[in-house]
């Protein structure tokens, strides 16, 4: 367990550590046990975050030229699907002709890292890892290489004399990985057969959106690498299902953006998409009409204010404005507005959402990028489509 804490919105949360740190710790521990011919219960590793981790070592087994052990994943107070699972490393000394072709890209002539049971394989272009390679990201690979080199140096060994022409082969595996991967984003990211060994800092920051955003961005990158020039962004399952069922949109061309409207729009620009369709429930996308680019309620709400302001600009009577302002949901607003004959406000909101998106993305004439917005009610009916 890691005793590192952060405060978010006045609440105290415990940090955790990534699957990459687990793989690194298990590898280092296995090497120490192989060198010293004894078991250890704990190992210390450094992280790119600058935080040292003392990791408990479990499930130790050994042979003449190999040791394997595990570290249990601890997500801190940011619990995800991989929390509590065992990440194993098997470190062995092998002859050069025993090094498998299926391995990670790593800048070393003596250390080779591959994956075993429960670790996924990359199947699509667009990620930082080449298709066909183990789903072990570059930062964990660098962490493992660094700890292996430092451990050998501290032991006072000349690595090439010690190895005598042999190689160090590390196999990362997770017996529960294939089942747990079903509860992750991996299938959307073109990773099949298991979990990913990930982490850019080695530390899991509780209540942080960064990992989520990176996963969504990676999904966009895959779609672009497939040659797609148009993409559909939806807040969640409701928008996805409506766009697919009612408008025949290709499910493979739809990416969920969650609350990160602005972030995902900027990613589409960075990746060079030519057309972006934003489709979803009016309760989420009305916020974009008011220039709000993170739709989470704790960031901003303003649904009533945006609706009332735009109705007022259309000349709606004060009593209607008060009635709409008193509504507890956007769907209740929609029903009242339809009955009052002011449905044109939905078209205004769709156009403003598209316009605000373009302003946020700083699109100029040279960008050649089209933005369309579709607003739906909860029953899936189209309220309006932008036309700007």
Where are these regions (language model features)?
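Generic N-terminal targeting/processing segments that precede catalytic cores or assembly contacts
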Residues: 1-183, 187-189
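A structural signal for small-residue-enriched, beta-sheet-centric alpha/beta enzyme cores
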Residues: 2-7, 14, 189, 195, ...
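Generic domain-boundary/flexible-linker signal
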Residues: 100, 124, 181, 242-244, ...
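C-terminal, non-catalytic interaction/recognition modules in large multi-subunit enzymes and RNPs
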Residues: 378, 383-388
């Amino acid at each position: 367990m890691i005793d590192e804490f952060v405060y978010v919105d006045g609440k105290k949360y415990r940090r955790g550590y990534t699957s990459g740190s687990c793989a690194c710790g298990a590898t280092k521990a296995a090497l120490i046990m192989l060198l010293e011919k004894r078991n250890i219960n704990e190992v210390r590793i450094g992280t790119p975050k600058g935080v040292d981790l003392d990791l408990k070592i479990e499930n130790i087994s050994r042979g003449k030229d190999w040791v394997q052990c595990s570290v249990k994943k601890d997500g801190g107070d940011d619990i995800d699907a991989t929390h509590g699972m065992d990440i194993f490393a098997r470190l062995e000394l092998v002859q050069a002709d025993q090094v498998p072709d299926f391995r990670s890209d790593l800048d070393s002539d003596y250390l080779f890292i591959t994956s075993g049971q429960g670790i996924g394989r990359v199947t699509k272009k667009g990620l930082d890892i080449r298709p066909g390679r183990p789903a072990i990201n570059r930062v964990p690979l660098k962490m493992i290489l660094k700890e292996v080199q430092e451990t050998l140096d501290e032991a006072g060994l000349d690595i090439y004399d010690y190895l005598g022409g042999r190689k160090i082969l590390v196999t990362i595996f997770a017996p529960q990985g294939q089942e747990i991967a079903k509860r992750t984003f991996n299938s959307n990211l073109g990773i099949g057969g298991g979990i990913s060994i990930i982490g850019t800092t080695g530390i899991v920051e509780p209540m942080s959106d960064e990992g989520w955003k990176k996963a969504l961005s990676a999904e966009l990158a895959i779609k672009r690498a497939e040659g797609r020039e148009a993409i559909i962004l939806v807040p969640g399952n409701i928008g996805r299902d409506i766009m697919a069922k009612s408008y025949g949109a290709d499910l493979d061309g739809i990416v969920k953006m969650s609350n990160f409207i602005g972030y995902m729009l900027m990613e589409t620009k960075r990746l060079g998409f030519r057309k972006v369709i934003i489709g979803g429930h009016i309760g989420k996308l009305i916020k974009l009409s008011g220039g709000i680019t993170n739709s989470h309620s704790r960031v901003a709400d303003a649904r009533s204010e945006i609706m009332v302001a735009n109705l007022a600009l259309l000349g709606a009577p004060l009593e209607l404005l008060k009635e709409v302002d008193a509504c507890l949901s956007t769907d209740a607003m929609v029903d009242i507005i339809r009955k009052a004959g002011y449905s044109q406000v939905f078209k205004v909101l769709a156009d403003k959402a598209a316009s605000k998106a373009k302003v946020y993305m700083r699109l100029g004439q040279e960008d050649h990028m089209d933005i369309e917005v579709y607003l739906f009610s909860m029953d899936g009916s189209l309220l309006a489509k932008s036309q700007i």
